[in-house]
Structures are given as structure tokens and as C-alpha cells.
Amino acid sequence: PLYFKGSMLGGYPRELQVTLVDIPNRNVIEDFTQGRLDIDTKINSSYDIKIIAGERSYVVQMVEEILADIPEQYSLSQNYPNPFNPITNINYSVPRSGSVTLAIYNIMGQRVTTLVSGNMKYGYHSVVWNGLDQSGRQVSSGVYFSELSARGFRQTKKMLLLK
């Protein structure tokens, strides 16, 4: 295990606030000079934290901005436009950095193409599907499904391609 403990040599000005934001857990340790963060290195090979120091009003504003950029849960939004021809946008949210897959399937459940596959940083993301399959061929009109999967999460949305 690895742990962080905040301290300052010789004390610090009374108006200074030191706050740590534990990104993966959306946890805020407001007075980090008195706090401690434990990280299990067997589970985490990398870990995102942010430390903010300054006057209280500045620290509060920065923490709010940081947390606003971190989704609370995985989600897959409905594509837009829908119906589409031939291009559509797909937005999705990733609350924790890690492996994510976003794939397109046809009405028979066959994978048509994979738009995203690999490690993604936490945040709000967008990808464009141009109506092409994995081989670069234009797919026919019809119903398709976008599916986001990550860490046991799976969500599917129905899309309609009209030509």
C-alpha cells in the first residue's frame, strides 16, 4: 500500500487551505494537512489526485470545477441526430479511468464496428460514427445499436440509419 499524508514544515498561514481531491472516488479531503489518503497499489497502477492550496474561496471554486468534470457514473447518451444519414454523434461518460469499449451492432446482434476500445481517461467523451463497418464499407439503412461497456457496466441505445 501507498499513502499520502499532508504536512508543512514550520506551519502555514491561517488563510491557506490545502485540499486534496481523490479523483477516482470523488472524495475531497478539505484539510489535507490533517488528512491521509491510502492507495492499494495491488489494485491501482496509477491514481489521479489533485492538490489545491490557496485561500478558501479559491479552493472551493477549484474543487467545484474539478468535480464538475468528473461524471458520477457511466452513461451512454442517445445518438444525435437520430435518425441519421450518414453521420451521427455519440456521447458517453466515464467516471473512472480504465478500459472502455463502444461498439456498433446490427439488428441481428452482429458487431458492425468498434468505435472505442482501450483505456480512457475519466470525463465526458464524444465519438462520431460515419456509418461505415469495420472494413470501411458503408452499411445499409436500418436499425443499429450502440453499446458502451466498462467495468461491469453495459448500456445500449437504438439508432436508425436512413438513406
Label the predicted regions.
Residues 153-157:
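Extracellular and select intracellular beta-sandwich modules with Ser/Thr-enriched
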Residues 1-14:
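Proteolytic processing hotspots in large secreted/extracellular or virion-associated proteins
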Residues 26-69:
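Short, compositionally biased serine/threonine- and acidic-rich segments at solvent-exposed termini, linkers
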Residues 159-163:
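Short beta-strand edge segments in extracellular beta-sheet folds
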Residues 97, 116-151:
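Short, surface-exposed loop/turn motifs with a glycine/proline- and acidic-biased composition
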Residues 29, 112-113, 139:
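Generic structural signal for well-ordered beta-strand positions
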Residues 62-80, 84-105, 114-117, 126, ...:
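Glycine-centered coil/turn sites that cap beta-strands in beta-rich domains
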